Amino acid sequence: MTTTADPKTAVPLVRLTDAGKNYGNIIALQGVTLEVGGSEVTCVLGDNGAGKSTLIKIIAGLHQHTHGTYEVEGEPVQFASPREALDRGIATVYQDLAVVPLMPVWRNFFLGNEIRKGPAMDIAAMRRTAKQELLDMGIDLRDVDQPIGTLSGGERQCVAIARAVHFGARVLILDEPTAALGVKQSGVVLRYIIQAKERGLGVIFITHNPHHAYPVGDRFLILKRGRSLGYWKKDEVSMAELTGLMAGGSELEELTHELEQAGGEGSGLREVAQVFEQEVAELHVAELGAGRTPPSEGTDTRQGPTEP
Protein backbone atom coordinates (compact mmCIF):
# COMPACT_ATOMS: atom_id res chain seq x y z
CA MET A 1 0.00 0.00 0.00
CA THR A 2 1.37 3.41 -0.95
CA THR A 3 1.08 6.40 1.33
CA THR A 4 1.02 10.05 0.42
CA ALA A 5 3.04 12.52 2.47
CA ASP A 6 1.07 15.12 4.30
CA PRO A 7 1.90 18.46 2.58
CA LYS A 8 1.82 20.16 5.97
CA THR A 9 4.68 17.96 7.28
CA ALA A 10 6.56 17.16 4.06
CA VAL A 11 9.81 18.85 3.08
CA PRO A 12 8.99 22.08 1.19
CA LEU A 13 9.26 21.87 -2.58
CA VAL A 14 11.20 25.15 -2.60
CA ARG A 15 12.89 26.93 0.29
CA LEU A 16 15.09 30.02 0.31
CA THR A 17 16.87 30.98 3.52
CA ASP A 18 18.47 34.41 3.94
CA ALA A 19 18.95 34.54 0.16
CA GLY A 20 20.50 37.52 -1.56
CA LYS A 21 21.81 38.71 -4.92
CA ASN A 22 24.52 41.25 -5.65
CA TYR A 23 25.34 42.74 -9.05
CA GLY A 24 28.86 43.94 -8.39
CA ASN A 25 28.56 46.37 -5.50
CA ILE A 26 24.79 46.79 -6.01
CA ILE A 27 22.61 44.86 -3.55
CA ALA A 28 19.50 43.79 -5.48
CA LEU A 29 18.16 41.35 -2.89
CA GLN A 30 19.14 40.75 0.71
CA GLY A 31 18.05 38.44 3.52
CA VAL A 32 14.97 36.94 1.87
CA THR A 33 13.42 33.79 3.33
CA LEU A 34 10.43 31.92 1.92
CA GLU A 35 9.13 28.43 1.31
CA VAL A 36 6.36 26.73 -0.61
CA GLY A 37 5.13 23.18 -0.20
CA GLY A 38 2.76 21.03 -2.18
CA SER A 39 -0.83 22.31 -2.13
CA GLU A 40 0.35 25.72 -0.91
CA VAL A 41 0.33 29.24 -2.33
CA THR A 42 3.10 31.59 -1.22
CA CYS A 43 2.41 35.20 -2.19
CA VAL A 44 5.27 37.63 -2.79
CA LEU A 45 4.11 41.23 -2.62
CA GLY A 46 5.96 44.42 -3.37
CA ASP A 47 5.83 47.64 -5.33
CA ASN A 48 7.90 48.40 -8.43
CA GLY A 49 11.60 48.01 -7.67
CA ALA A 50 10.97 45.87 -4.59
CA GLY A 51 13.06 42.96 -5.86
CA LYS A 52 10.29 40.64 -7.06
CA SER A 53 11.83 40.14 -10.51
CA THR A 54 15.25 39.34 -9.04
CA LEU A 55 13.65 36.78 -6.73
CA ILE A 56 11.81 35.16 -9.66
CA LYS A 57 15.04 34.94 -11.67
CA ILE A 58 16.86 33.20 -8.82
CA ILE A 59 14.11 30.61 -8.29
CA ALA A 60 13.67 30.05 -12.05
CA GLY A 61 17.40 29.56 -12.68
CA LEU A 62 18.02 32.72 -14.72
CA HIS A 63 20.36 34.12 -12.05
CA GLN A 64 22.29 32.51 -9.23
CA HIS A 65 21.98 33.71 -5.65
CA THR A 66 25.16 35.12 -4.12
CA HIS A 67 24.14 34.75 -0.45
CA GLY A 68 22.08 32.34 1.60
CA THR A 69 20.73 28.97 0.53
CA TYR A 70 18.25 27.73 -2.08
CA GLU A 71 16.84 24.22 -1.59
CA VAL A 72 14.58 22.09 -3.76
CA GLU A 73 12.98 19.26 -1.76
CA GLY A 74 15.67 19.67 0.89
CA GLU A 75 18.60 19.57 -1.55
CA PRO A 76 20.78 22.70 -1.89
CA VAL A 77 20.85 23.88 -5.50
CA GLN A 78 22.33 26.65 -7.61
CA PHE A 79 20.81 26.39 -11.07
CA ALA A 80 22.95 27.38 -14.04
CA SER A 81 20.00 27.75 -16.41
CA PRO A 82 16.18 27.80 -16.53
CA ARG A 83 16.32 24.33 -18.11
CA GLU A 84 17.85 22.94 -14.91
CA ALA A 85 15.03 24.49 -12.87
CA LEU A 86 12.43 23.14 -15.30
CA ASP A 87 13.95 19.66 -15.04
CA ARG A 88 13.31 19.88 -11.28
CA GLY A 89 9.68 20.82 -11.90
CA ILE A 90 9.93 24.59 -11.43
CA ALA A 91 8.06 26.44 -14.19
CA THR A 92 7.52 30.17 -14.62
CA VAL A 93 4.52 31.81 -16.27
CA TYR A 94 5.57 35.35 -17.20
CA GLN A 95 3.30 38.29 -17.91
CA ASP A 96 3.95 38.14 -21.67
CA LEU A 97 2.97 34.40 -21.64
CA ALA A 98 5.15 33.50 -24.68
CA VAL A 99 2.19 32.76 -26.95
CA VAL A 100 1.65 33.40 -30.66
CA PRO A 101 -1.71 35.23 -30.93
CA LEU A 102 -2.65 33.99 -34.43
CA MET A 103 -1.92 30.33 -33.70
CA PRO A 104 -4.70 28.08 -32.35
CA VAL A 105 -4.91 27.25 -28.66
CA TRP A 106 -3.71 23.65 -29.11
CA ARG A 107 -0.69 24.81 -31.15
CA ASN A 108 0.34 27.27 -28.45
CA PHE A 109 -0.21 24.60 -25.80
CA PHE A 110 2.44 22.37 -27.40
CA LEU A 111 4.67 25.11 -28.83
CA GLY A 112 8.22 23.75 -28.81
CA ASN A 113 7.07 20.38 -27.42
CA GLU A 114 5.01 19.03 -30.31
CA ILE A 115 3.78 15.43 -30.36
CA ARG A 116 5.05 13.68 -33.48
CA LYS A 117 3.88 10.69 -35.45
CA GLY A 118 6.84 9.82 -37.59
CA PRO A 119 8.15 12.97 -39.32
CA ALA A 120 4.80 14.80 -39.03
CA MET A 121 3.04 16.37 -36.07
CA ASP A 122 0.22 14.34 -34.51
CA ILE A 123 -2.35 17.14 -34.68
CA ALA A 124 -5.28 15.00 -33.54
CA ALA A 125 -3.42 13.90 -30.40
CA MET A 126 -2.39 17.47 -29.59
CA ARG A 127 -5.94 18.76 -30.03
CA ARG A 128 -7.32 15.99 -27.84
CA THR A 129 -4.68 16.37 -25.13
CA ALA A 130 -4.94 20.17 -24.99
CA LYS A 131 -8.73 19.97 -24.67
CA GLN A 132 -8.53 17.40 -21.86
CA GLU A 133 -5.79 19.18 -19.92
CA LEU A 134 -7.73 22.43 -20.04
CA LEU A 135 -10.89 20.64 -18.85
CA ASP A 136 -8.93 19.09 -15.98
CA MET A 137 -8.04 22.63 -14.87
CA GLY A 138 -11.69 23.65 -15.18
CA ILE A 139 -11.15 25.57 -18.44
CA ASP A 140 -13.93 24.72 -20.91
CA LEU A 141 -13.12 26.45 -24.21
CA ARG A 142 -15.54 26.45 -27.11
CA ASP A 143 -12.88 25.28 -29.55
CA VAL A 144 -9.15 24.63 -29.15
CA ASP A 145 -8.77 25.52 -32.85
CA GLN A 146 -9.58 29.18 -32.19
CA PRO A 147 -6.61 31.59 -32.22
CA ILE A 148 -5.35 32.10 -28.69
CA GLY A 149 -5.42 35.85 -29.34
CA THR A 150 -9.24 35.71 -29.34
CA LEU A 151 -9.29 34.58 -25.70
CA SER A 152 -9.58 37.01 -22.83
CA GLY A 153 -6.48 37.91 -20.85
CA GLY A 154 -7.60 35.71 -17.97
CA GLU A 155 -8.21 32.73 -20.26
CA ARG A 156 -4.76 33.11 -21.84
CA GLN A 157 -3.19 33.13 -18.39
CA CYS A 158 -5.07 29.95 -17.51
CA VAL A 159 -3.98 28.21 -20.73
CA ALA A 160 -0.37 29.05 -19.83
CA ILE A 161 -0.87 27.62 -16.32
CA ALA A 162 -2.42 24.41 -17.70
CA ARG A 163 0.44 24.10 -20.19
CA ALA A 164 3.04 24.33 -17.41
CA VAL A 165 1.20 21.73 -15.33
CA HIS A 166 0.96 19.33 -18.29
CA PHE A 167 4.70 19.47 -18.90
CA GLY A 168 5.57 18.40 -15.38
CA ALA A 169 5.56 21.53 -13.23
CA ARG A 170 5.43 20.87 -9.50
CA VAL A 171 6.09 24.49 -8.57
CA LEU A 172 4.46 27.31 -10.53
CA ILE A 173 5.92 30.82 -10.41
CA LEU A 174 3.24 33.24 -11.58
CA ASP A 175 4.63 36.67 -12.46
CA GLU A 176 1.84 39.17 -11.70
CA PRO A 177 -0.81 37.21 -13.64
CA THR A 178 -3.60 39.63 -12.65
CA ALA A 179 -1.66 42.88 -13.20
CA ALA A 180 -3.29 43.90 -16.51
CA LEU A 181 -6.70 42.32 -15.93
CA GLY A 182 -10.07 43.67 -14.86
CA VAL A 183 -11.96 42.50 -11.79
CA LYS A 184 -13.82 39.64 -13.51
CA GLN A 185 -10.79 38.26 -15.36
CA SER A 186 -8.65 38.54 -12.22
CA GLY A 187 -11.22 36.37 -10.48
CA VAL A 188 -10.90 33.80 -13.26
CA VAL A 189 -7.12 33.59 -12.76
CA LEU A 190 -7.44 33.37 -8.96
CA ARG A 191 -9.88 30.49 -9.39
CA TYR A 192 -7.33 28.58 -11.46
CA ILE A 193 -4.59 29.27 -8.93
CA ILE A 194 -6.79 27.46 -6.41
CA GLN A 195 -7.28 24.66 -8.97
CA ALA A 196 -3.50 24.25 -9.24
CA LYS A 197 -3.18 24.22 -5.45
CA GLU A 198 -5.87 21.55 -5.14
CA ARG A 199 -3.95 19.39 -7.64
CA GLY A 200 -1.00 19.35 -5.23
CA LEU A 201 1.20 21.97 -6.86
CA GLY A 202 3.14 24.61 -5.00
CA VAL A 203 2.43 28.12 -6.31
CA ILE A 204 4.56 31.25 -5.90
CA PHE A 205 2.21 34.11 -6.71
CA ILE A 206 3.97 37.41 -7.46
CA THR A 207 1.70 40.43 -7.15
CA HIS A 208 1.44 44.01 -5.94
CA ASN A 209 -2.23 43.61 -4.98
CA PRO A 210 -2.96 42.29 -1.45
CA HIS A 211 -6.66 42.01 -2.34
CA HIS A 212 -5.74 39.37 -4.92
CA ALA A 213 -3.13 37.66 -2.73
CA TYR A 214 -4.97 37.26 0.58
CA PRO A 215 -7.94 35.12 -0.56
CA VAL A 216 -5.70 32.47 -2.18
CA GLY A 217 -2.46 32.69 -0.16
CA ASP A 218 -1.15 30.48 2.64
CA ARG A 219 2.07 32.45 3.26
CA PHE A 220 2.95 36.06 2.53
CA LEU A 221 6.29 37.77 1.92
CA ILE A 222 6.50 41.54 1.49
CA LEU A 223 9.54 43.01 -0.24
CA LYS A 224 10.67 46.62 -0.27
CA ARG A 225 13.84 47.83 -1.99
CA GLY A 226 15.26 44.33 -2.08
CA ARG A 227 14.66 43.54 1.59
CA SER A 228 11.99 41.64 3.47
CA LEU A 229 9.46 43.63 5.49
CA GLY A 230 8.01 40.41 6.88
CA TYR A 231 7.08 36.81 6.25
CA TRP A 232 3.87 35.40 7.70
CA LYS A 233 1.47 32.50 7.60
CA LYS A 234 -2.14 33.44 6.89
CA ASP A 235 -3.25 33.22 10.52
CA GLU A 236 -0.45 35.60 11.55
CA VAL A 237 -1.42 38.59 9.41
CA SER A 238 -4.65 40.27 8.35
CA MET A 239 -5.67 41.79 5.04
CA ALA A 240 -5.57 45.23 6.67
CA GLU A 241 -1.98 44.72 7.82
CA LEU A 242 -0.84 43.57 4.39
CA THR A 243 -2.61 46.51 2.77
CA GLY A 244 -1.09 48.95 5.26
CA LEU A 245 2.44 47.71 4.62
CA MET A 246 1.92 47.73 0.86
CA ALA A 247 0.43 51.24 0.98
CA GLY A 248 3.43 52.52 2.88
CA GLY A 249 1.78 52.95 6.28
CA SER A 250 3.63 55.94 7.78
CA GLU A 251 4.60 57.13 4.29
CA LEU A 252 0.91 57.37 3.38
CA GLU A 253 0.21 59.48 6.47
CA GLU A 254 3.15 61.79 5.66
CA LEU A 255 1.82 62.23 2.13
CA THR A 256 -1.61 63.04 3.53
CA HIS A 257 -0.15 65.84 5.69
CA GLU A 258 1.83 67.22 2.75
CA LEU A 259 -1.31 67.32 0.62
CA GLU A 260 -3.23 69.02 3.42
CA GLN A 261 -0.57 71.72 3.70
CA ALA A 262 -0.66 72.26 -0.06
CA GLY A 263 -4.47 72.12 -0.11
CA GLY A 264 -4.83 75.88 0.05
CA GLU A 265 -3.35 76.13 -3.45
CA GLY A 266 -6.28 74.39 -5.14
CA SER A 267 -9.45 72.45 -4.51
CA GLY A 268 -8.09 69.46 -6.45
CA LEU A 269 -5.30 68.93 -3.93
CA ARG A 270 -7.76 69.25 -1.06
CA GLU A 271 -9.91 66.51 -2.59
CA VAL A 272 -6.89 64.23 -3.02
CA ALA A 273 -5.90 64.84 0.60
CA GLN A 274 -9.40 63.89 1.75
CA VAL A 275 -9.20 60.61 -0.18
CA PHE A 276 -5.87 59.75 1.44
CA GLU A 277 -7.23 60.66 4.88
CA GLN A 278 -10.14 58.29 4.34
CA GLU A 279 -7.83 55.45 3.25
CA VAL A 280 -5.58 55.89 6.30
CA ALA A 281 -8.62 55.95 8.61
CA GLU A 282 -10.03 52.79 7.03
CA LEU A 283 -6.71 50.99 7.51
CA HIS A 284 -6.60 51.93 11.21
CA VAL A 285 -10.21 50.85 11.74
CA ALA A 286 -9.58 47.52 10.02
CA GLU A 287 -6.46 46.90 12.11
CA LEU A 288 -8.33 47.60 15.35
CA GLY A 289 -11.21 45.42 14.20
CA ALA A 290 -8.79 42.54 13.65
CA GLY A 291 -7.94 42.74 17.37
CA ARG A 292 -4.20 42.89 16.88
CA THR A 293 -1.36 45.37 16.79
CA PRO A 294 -0.30 45.94 13.19
CA PRO A 295 3.28 44.88 12.39
CA SER A 296 5.57 47.88 12.17
CA GLU A 297 7.17 48.60 8.84
CA GLY A 298 10.73 47.31 8.61
CA THR A 299 10.32 44.98 11.61
CA ASP A 300 10.28 41.30 10.73
CA THR A 301 9.38 39.28 13.81
CA ARG A 302 8.77 36.09 11.85
CA GLN A 303 11.59 36.07 9.34
CA GLY A 304 12.10 32.33 8.99
CA PRO A 305 9.60 29.62 8.13
CA THR A 306 8.22 28.11 11.33
CA GLU A 307 8.34 24.36 11.78
CA PRO A 308 4.93 22.63 11.95
Where are each of the predicted segments found?
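Glycine-rich phosphate-binding loops of nucleotide-dependent enzymes
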Residues: 2-287
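Long, low-complexity, intrinsically disordered segments
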Residues: 286-308
